[in-house]
C-alpha cells in the first residue's frame, strides 16, 4: 500500500546513516513484498467491488460474511507465509542473493531484517483488507487521517529505535506502526458498524495458527538439516531449496485439509460463493 511504501522510504533515509543498512533492508523488503503483493493486492481488487455492491443493496449480514471470509482465506496464506519467513530467512536470502559482493555477513543482516518484517506481514495484509471497506462506504478521509498518524508514528519510532537497534529498529518501527494502523482501522469499523464479525471467525483462525505452528516446527527441523549439509554446488542447493518449498506447501495444506471447512471441496465452494 502507499502508506507502507512511505514508511519504507522514511526508513531508507534514516538507514543511510548506517553503512550497508539500506541494502539489508532493501533485500529483506523484496522478499516479503512477494506474498504481500500476491495476497494483498488480489484481495483489494476483489473485495472492494463486492462490498460496494452489497452496501448499495443494503445486505449488511452478507457484507460481514464477505469480509470474514476474506480475512480467513487471506490468513490461510498469510500466517504460514509469515511463519516460513520468520523460521527460514537466512536460507531464503542466501539462496536468492548470496553471491559476489553479497557475502555471508550481508545474508545474516538481511535475514535479521526479514525476520522482523515477517512479524508485520499479517498487519500489512489486514490493512489491505480493512481500508477498502471505508472506500466502499464512500469514506476515504479517515483512512487518509489514519495513514498520516501512522507515518508520524513510524518516523518517530524509526529515529528512536535506529539509535537503539540500528537498521533492525527501522524494520521494527515499520511493523509496529502497521499494527497500530490495523488497530485504528478495525476499531473505527467496529464502532461505526461498518463491520462486525461473528464468533464463527475464531475457529478457522485458531486452526490456521495451530497448523502454521506445526509447519514452523517442520521448517525449523528441515532448515537445520539443510544448514548441516552445506552444499557448495548451486544445482544441489537449488534442488534442496525447491524441495523445502514444495514439501512445506504439501505439509501445510495436507494438515489443514483435515479441518472440514478447509478441505478442497468446501474450500472451492466457499471461495466461489458470493456470500
Name each model-derived stretch:
Residues 1-275:
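Membrane-embedded alpha-helical bundles of multi-pass transporters/translocases
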Amino acid at each position: 500500500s502507499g502508506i507502507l511504501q512511505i514508511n519504507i522510504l522514511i526508513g531508507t533515509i534514516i538507514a543511510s546513516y548506517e553503512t550497508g543498512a539500506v541494502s539489508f533492508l532493501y533485500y529483506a523488503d523484496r522478499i516479503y513484498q512477494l506474498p504481500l503483493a500476491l495476497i494483498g493486492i488480489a484481495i483489494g481488487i476483489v473485495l472492494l467491488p463486492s462490498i460496494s455492491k452489497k452496501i448499495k443493496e443494503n445486505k449488511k449480514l452478507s457484507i460481514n460474511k464477505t469480509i470474514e471470509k476474506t480475512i480467513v482465506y487471506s490468513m490461510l496464506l498469510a500466517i504460514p507465509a509469515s511463519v516460513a519467513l520468520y523460521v527460514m530467512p537466512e536460507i531464503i536470502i542466501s539462496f536468492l542473493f548470496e553471491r559476489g559482493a553479497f557475502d555471508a555477513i550481508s545474508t545474516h543482516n538481511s535475514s535479521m531484517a526479514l525476520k522482523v518484517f515477517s512479524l508485520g506481514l499479517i498487519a500489512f495484509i489486514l490493512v489491505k483488507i480493512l481500508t477498502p471497506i471505508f472506500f466502499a462506504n464512500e469514506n476515504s478521509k479517515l483512512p487518509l487521517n489514519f495513514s498520516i498518524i501512522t507515518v508520524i508514528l513510524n518516523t518517530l519510532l524509526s529515529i528512536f529505535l535506529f539509535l537503539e537497534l540500528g537498521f533492525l529498529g527501522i524494520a521494527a518501527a515499520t511493523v509496529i506502526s502497521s499494527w497500530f494502523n490495523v488497530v485504528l482501522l478495525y476499531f473505527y469499523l467496529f464502532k461505526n458498524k461498518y463491520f462486525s464479525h461473528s464468533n464463527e471467525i475464531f475457529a478457522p483462525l485458531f486452526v490456521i495458527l495451530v497448523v502454521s505452528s506445526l509447519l514452523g516446527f517442520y521448517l525449523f527441523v528441515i532448515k537445520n538439516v539443510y544448514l548441516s549439509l552445506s552444499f557448495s554446488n548451486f544445482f544441489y542447493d537449488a534442488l534442496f531449496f525447491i524441495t523445502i518449498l514444495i514439501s512445506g506447501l504439501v505439509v501445510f495444506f495436507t494438515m489443514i485439509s483435515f479441518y472440514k471447512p478447509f478441505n478442497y471441496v468446501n474450500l472451492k465452494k466457499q471461495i466461489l460463493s458470493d456470500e
